[in-house]
């Protein structure tokens, strides 16, 4: 098992020094789900929400969240992201919305936390916009789907998970 990089020998949390690392293209994808009643999903898909376009708002929120991850998660580095993409898809057969985020940069540290934050905040935004209609929506699971670049190598979720 790998060592925790954010904990020093004394057991104290610290920000990892990435100054000696090589700049490489880094990419990460994450997903999140929001499960709801079929009527709530239909309202979103049909564009009948009185607050406006739920998907467009969630997309912008996810992009903003990726760019501000370093302000939310204490030991994350501020990153110069070159791409953030948020895809939202209604899955009526499961009464849910699937959110997939993609973050990319050329840099010295990965973008996994940015991708996870983007997907999570997009899901939270859907909940926020629809909570007046349904309070018992469920957010989750949220997970990393894939990452590439960097010293630790590539990762991809098993297709059967």
From Swiss-Prot:
Top-level EC class: lyase
EC number: 4.6.1.17
GO molecular function, one term: cyclic pyranopterin monophosphate synthase activity
Pathway in which the depicted protein is active: Cofactor biosynthesis; molybdopterin biosynthesis
Active site: 128
Annotated coiled-coil segments of the chain: none
Residue sites binding substrate per the record: 75-77, 113-114
InterPro entries, per the entry: MoaC (IPR023045), MoaC_bact/euk (IPR047594), MoaC_sf (IPR036522), MoCo_biosynth_MoaA/MoaC (IPR050105), Mopterin_CF_biosynth-C_dom (IPR002820)
Catalytic activity: (8S)-3',8-cyclo-7,8-dihydroguanosine 5'-triphosphate = cyclic pyranopterin phosphate + diphosphate
BP-aspect Gene Ontology terms: Mo-molybdopterin cofactor biosynthetic process
Keyword flag Lyase: yes
Keywords, ordered alphabetically: Lyase, Molybdenum cofactor biosynthesis
Superkingdom of origin: Bacteria
TM ranges: none
HAMAP family listed in its UniProt record: MoaC_B (MF_01224_B)
Subunit structure: Homohexamer; trimer of dimers.
Similarity comment: Belongs to the MoaC family.
Function: Catalyzes the conversion of (8S)-3',8-cyclo-7,8-dihydroguanosine 5'-triphosphate to cyclic pyranopterin monophosphate (cPMP).
Name the UniProt record assigns to this protein: Cyclic pyranopterin monophosphate synthase
Source organism phylogeny: Bacteria, Pseudomonadati, Pseudomonadota, Gammaproteobacteria, Enterobacterales
């Amino acid at each position: 098992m790998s060592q925790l990089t954010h904990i020093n020998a004394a057991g104290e949390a610290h920000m990892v020094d990435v100054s000696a690392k090589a700049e490489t293209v880094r990419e990460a994808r994450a997903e999140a789900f929001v499960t709801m009643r079929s009527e709530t999903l239909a309202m979103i898909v049909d564009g009948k929400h009185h607050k406006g376009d739920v998907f467009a708002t969630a997309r912008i929120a996810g992009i903003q969240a990726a760019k501000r991850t370093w302000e939310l998660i204490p030991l994350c580095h501020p990153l110069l992201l070159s791409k953030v993409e948020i895809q939202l898809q209604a899955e009526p057969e499961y009464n849910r919305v699937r959110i997939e985020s993609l973050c990319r940069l050329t840099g010295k540290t990965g973008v996994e936390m940015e991708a996870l934050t983007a997907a999570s905040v997009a899901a939270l935004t859907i909940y926020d916009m629809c909570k007046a209609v349904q309070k018992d929506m469920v957010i989750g699971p949220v997970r990393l789907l894939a990452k590439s670049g960097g010293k630790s190598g590539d990762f991809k979720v098993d297709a059967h998970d």
